[in-house]
Every structure is written in structure tokens, then in C-alpha cells.
Swiss-Prot record:
Keywords: Cytoplasm, DNA-binding, Transcription, Transcription regulation. Its main location: cytoplasm. One of its GO terms (molecular function) is DNA binding. GO terms for biological process: regulation of DNA-templated transcription. It comes from Lachnoclostridium phytofermentans (strain ATCC 700394 / DSM 18823 / ISDg) (Clostridium phytofermentans). Coiled coil: none annotated. HAMAP family: Transcrip_reg_TACO1. This is Probable transcriptional regulatory protein Cphy_2507. It is found in: Cytoplasm. Belongs to the TACO1 family. PANTHER family: TRANSCRIPTIONAL REGULATORY PROTEIN YEBC-RELATED (PTHR12532:SF6), TRANSLATIONAL ACTIVATOR OF CYTOCHROME C OXIDASE 1 (PTHR12532). InterPro entries: Integrase-like_N, TACO1_YebC-like_2nd/3rd_dom, TACO1_YebC_N, Transcrip_reg_TACO1-like, Transcrip_reg_TACO1-like_dom3, YebC-like. GO terms for cellular component: cytosol.
């Protein structure tokens, strides 16, 4: 298949900088709340919710915590209304950064995101200023040690289900799909007993930017760390070749 998409670098993974599982669960809880509001509380009738529940389980979120999040979101009175917002901007040496957030206060979130860019000598741009540099894809990462299926069999299973690409690294496999095909491919792998480290729709850079200047490296890490610390921020994508 085609060359790999550097999936180890696709996004600045918030999980690695989170001090506790609680922060991860809080972010997943917000995603659940939005999915329930948009499509109802039954995962069998709400593919977006079904995908998020699978993502939550992959992050070891307990079933009772998932159930409570769904029930809370389904209740009219106590549910917080979160709005999905996206910010695009530039880091050092023209690196492209996309920030996805779920917030109940857009003014607060916008100010925090702008501050994170400014502190790293970057800037927030207009909508569309960098998103054209990325492709939206469904992405599934599978740990080789956890997977009993042979590489060729796994590839054929994924491609037959509708995957657009299959890549193999030293310790993992990557399955890529078009966004509309993601749910079907994920469910097919799940039913076949394939363990998934990560399964979500993501943004994959078309090209990568290398940074060697110490000041640039310090600045981009500062921006990404500040975004990590913001509870409103759900995902951060960039094209820095870490």
C-alpha cells in the first residue's frame, strides 16, 4: 500500500501530557454530551455516539462512567450545552496548527487559544487558512502485540470493509478510511476481535515541516503545551515533523 502517514506524529496527543485519566474522561464526556444532543442517547441509532463510546473504551473509560455521561447528557435539566469550535493558525516557520474545542463559553476559549499561539510566537488565522493542508480521514491504530491476526488477513479484512489504505510499522498497523466509511470499518474490525489502540476521525497533514532552530522548537512546544492545559481543547493537529 502507499507510504505511511506518520501516524505517530499526526496530532499532538493530549493523553501523553494529561496528569490523570480524569482529564481524558472529562474530554470524552463532552464529546458524548454533544453526540447525544445531536443524535440521541442510543448508540445503536447514533453512529457518532457509537464511535465515541468505542473511543472511550479504548481509553479505558469505565462502562459505568460512559453510561452516566450518556444519561446526564440525555437529561434536559443538568446537561451543559457545549458548542464545537475550530481554530486555525500558524506556529514557528509556517507550521500549520488546527485546534478543535468543545466549549460553553466561546469568548473564553478563543482568548485562551489566541494566548497559546501568541506565547509561542505564532498567530491565529482565519477559517480555512491551514485546513487545506490536511486531509480528514478515519484512522485506526492496532498494536501488533495485541493482534493475533496475520498482517495480510487484517489488511484484506479492512480493505474489504471499505478502508482506503493499510500501513504497517514496526510495532503497529494503521487503517485509513474516508470519514463516511469509518464507522463500518471500525465495527467490522471490532466484530472480528481486532483490538484497537485508537479509532477516530482525524486530520492528516499532506506535507510535514521540520524544525531545527532551538527557538522554534521551544516556541512550538510552548504553544502545544498551553493548548494541552486548556480543558476546552479536545484535539490539536499539526504538521510539525516531531
Amino acid at each position: 500500500m502507499s507510504g505511511h502517514s506518520k501516524f505517530a506524529n499526526i496530532k499532538h496527543k493530549k493523553e501523553k501530557n494529561d496528569a490523570t485519566k480524569g482529564k481524558i474522561f472529562t474530554r470524552l464526556g463532552r464529546e458524548i454530551a454533544v453526540a447525544v444532543k445531536e443524535g440521541g442517547p442510543d448508540p445503536n441509532n447514533n453512529n457518532k455516539l457509537k464511535d465515541i463510546v468505542a473511543k472511550a473504551k479504548a481509553n479505558n473509560m469505565p462502562n459505568d462512567t460512559i453510561d452516566r455521561s450518556i444519561k446526564k447528557a440525555a437529561g434536559e435539566g443538568n446537561a451543559v450545552n457545549y458548542e464545537f469550535v475550530t481554530y486555525e493558525g500558524y506556529g514557528p516557520s509556517g507550521t500549520a496548527i488546527i485546534v478543535e474545542a468543545l466549549t460553553d463559553n466561546k469568548n473564553r476559549t478563543a482568548a485562551n487559544v489566541r494566548n497559546a499561539f501568541t506565547k509561542g510566537n505564532g498567530s491565529v488565522g482565519t477559517q480555512g487558512c491551514v485546513s487545506y493542508m490536511f486531509d480528514q480521514k478515519g484512522q485506526i491504530i492496532i498494536d501488533k502485540e495485541e493482534c493475533d491476526m496475520a498482517s495480510d488477513d487484517l489488511m484484506m479484512l479492512a480493505l474489504d470493509a471499505g478502508a482506503s489504505d493499510f500501513n504497517e510499522e514496526d510495532d503497529s498497523f494503521e487503517v485509513l478510511t474516508e470519514p463516511d466509511d469509518f464507522s463500518v470499518v471500525r465495527e467490522t474490525l471490532e466484530k472480528a476481535g481486532v483490538p484497537m489502540m485508537q479509532a477516530e476521525v482525524t486530520m492528516i497533514p499532506q506535507t510535514w515541516v521540520e524544525l531545527s532552530d532551538e527557538t522554534d522548537l521551544k516556541n512550538i512546544n510552548r504553544t502545544l503545551d498551553l493548548l494541552d492545559e486548556d480543558d476546552d481543547v479536545q484535539q490539536v493537529y499539526h504538521n510539525w515533523d516531531e
